Amino acid sequence: MKKVVATGTFDIIHPGHVRFLEEAKKLGDYLVVIVAREKNVKHKPKPIMPEEQRRRVVEALKPVDEAILGDEEDIFKPIEKIKPDVIALGYDQHFDEEWLREELRKRGIKAEVVRIRAKEDCELCSSAKIIERIVTLASSRLKDFQERKEKL
């Protein structure tokens, strides 16, 4: 059985996440997703959803066979335990592939590292874009509400 690992924050699930996981699943037979711990998310704002809730949502997705929380101290511990054949990276993940390959080699992990390409036809395939859209719409609606209230 060929095991694939995919990792990510998966804060607000969107079509880009689903596509990434579908493509990762195609690389093997069994897909394990490592969901980032809040403590380890440093390259973007703190997640909106609690980590266990993010894990449960990811595990409910069709391509995912298993979803686990990452290790707070050593991001490689779950990978050492899983012993994947492939590690799938999203197009926007902040991992240098060569650095990752070297770290895996140092730990005796013989996994292929594959970067999944972005799909260009998705308007809201970014948690940041979704949050921005919500804030913009909420601000507009709040302004409309306040204007109507003043007319009463």
From Swiss-Prot:
Its cofactor is a divalent metal cation. The keyword Transmembrane helix does not apply. Pathway: Cofactor biosynthesis; FAD biosynthesis; FAD from FMN: step 1/1. GO terms for molecular function: ATP binding; FMN adenylyltransferase activity. Belongs to the archaeal FAD synthase family. It catalyses: FMN + ATP + H(+) = FAD + diphosphate. Keywords: ATP-binding, FAD, Flavoprotein, FMN, Nucleotide-binding, Nucleotidyltransferase, Transferase. The lineage of its organism: Archaea, Methanobacteriati, Methanobacteriota, Archaeoglobi, Archaeoglobales. Homodimer. It comes from Ferroglobus placidus (strain DSM 10642 / AEDII12DO). HAMAP family: FAD_synth_arch. Catalyzes the transfer of the AMP portion of ATP to flavin mononucleotide (FMN) to produce flavin adenine dinucleotide (FAD) coenzyme. One of its GO terms (biological process) is FAD biosynthetic process. The keyword Nucleotidyltransferase applies. ATP binds at residues 9-10, 14-17, 92. It is an enzyme of class 2 (transferase). Disulfide bonds: none annotated. It comes from the Archaea. Gene3D superfamilies: HUPs. Its EC number is 2.7.7.2. SUPFAM superfamilies: Nucleotidylyl transferase. This is FAD synthase.
